[in-house]
């Protein structure tokens, strides 16, 4: 409930791909479920978006390996003429954004946002206290009318604590507190896009690095005073490094796209879990997996 999971043509929420000015980002939501793309709050600042292209089929060749859909976000450029600053106070968060010129050939835009949901949830007596923070920036430099470089970044920090000191310790709240873990999530994407315009043709090079870190910790009866009460300590890290080149040739009556990509992904997992069943057991699991991927089109 209260999530914006995207499911297209019967596919799952983990089968979608997201691009921000050509840079792939692993997730666009706060408090996402690992392996899926949904969450209750979006990370991308909507004030920065110029347009969104949604593909549910016939995916572009440059965005292959897609099962369900592609969301391709195009961002605005910073103002070339003057500097502007904007503050936003919402029902659950506060934010500030700025954009403007950095010299004659460079523009920027940046935004930072932080929630105060933990105070609202505590006031209405909910057993969990979520907090999220995100930041986004874009810098664009035009060397000349034919060459430009864009550097962008997107990051988020999610933290969900347990409200063990709440006054309304009803049976329902006690049950939720008994199984809900403390959750910490961090994610970021950094990317650079170089474009060269040659008449009607376009040559692009995209490099990026993204990382998603998840931590779940749970103590029996939420008592952290004894080490033996630790029932769950889950840590995972997903790192992806990507290089892609796209070349668009506009010929009479046809447009030809040619390119290739190479990626290296590293996935690590460290899990410790106690299961309190009729026959108690402890699960200890560790893995470190590296994967190379490449493609041409």
Label every PLM stretch briefly.
Residues 80-81, 101-185:
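Periplasmic-side early beta-strands and strand-to-turn transitions of outer-membrane beta-barrels
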Residues 24-54, 137:
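Short acidic/polar hinge/loop motifs at secondary-structure boundaries
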Residues 40-84, 95-97, 104:
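A beta-strand signature from Gram-negative outer-membrane beta-barrel systems
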């Amino acid at each position: 409930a209260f999530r914006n999971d995207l499911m297209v043509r019967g596919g799952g929420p983990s089968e979608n791909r997201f691009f921000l000015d050509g840079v792939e980002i692993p997730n666009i939501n706060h408090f996402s479920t690992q392996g899926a793309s949904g969450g209750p709050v979006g990370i991308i600042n909507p004030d920065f978006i110029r347009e969104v292209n949604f593909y549910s089929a016939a995916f572009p060749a440059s965005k292959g390996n897609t099962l369900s859909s592609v969301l391709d976000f195009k961002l605005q450029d910073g103002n070339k003429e003057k500097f502007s600053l904007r503050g936003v106070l919402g029902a659950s968060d506060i934010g500030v954004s700025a954009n403007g010129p950095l010299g004659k050939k460079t523009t920027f835009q940046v935004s930072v946002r932080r929630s105060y949901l933990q105070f609202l949830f505590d006031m209405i007596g909910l057993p969990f206290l979520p907090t999220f923070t995100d930041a986004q920036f874009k810098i664009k430099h035009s060397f000349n009318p034919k060459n430009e470089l864009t550097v962008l970044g997107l990051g988020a920090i999610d933290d969900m604590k347990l409200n063990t000191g709440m006054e309304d310790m009803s049976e329902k709240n006690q049950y939720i507190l008994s199984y809900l873990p403390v959750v910490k999530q961090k994610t970021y994407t950094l990317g650079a896009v170089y474009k060269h315009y040659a008449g009607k043709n376009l040559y692009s090079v995209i490099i990026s690095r993204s990382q998603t870190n998840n931590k779940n910790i749970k103590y029996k009866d939420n008592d952290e005073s004894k080490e033996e009460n630790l029932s769950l300590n889950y840590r995972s890290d997903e790192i992806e490094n990507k290089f892609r080149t796209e070349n668009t040739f506009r010929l009479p009556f046809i447009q030809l796209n040619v390119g290739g990509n190479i990626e290296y992904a590293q996935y690590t997992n460290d899990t410790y879990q106690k299961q309190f069943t009729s026959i108690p057991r402890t699960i200890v699991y560790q893995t470190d997996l590296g994967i190379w991927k490449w493609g041409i089109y």
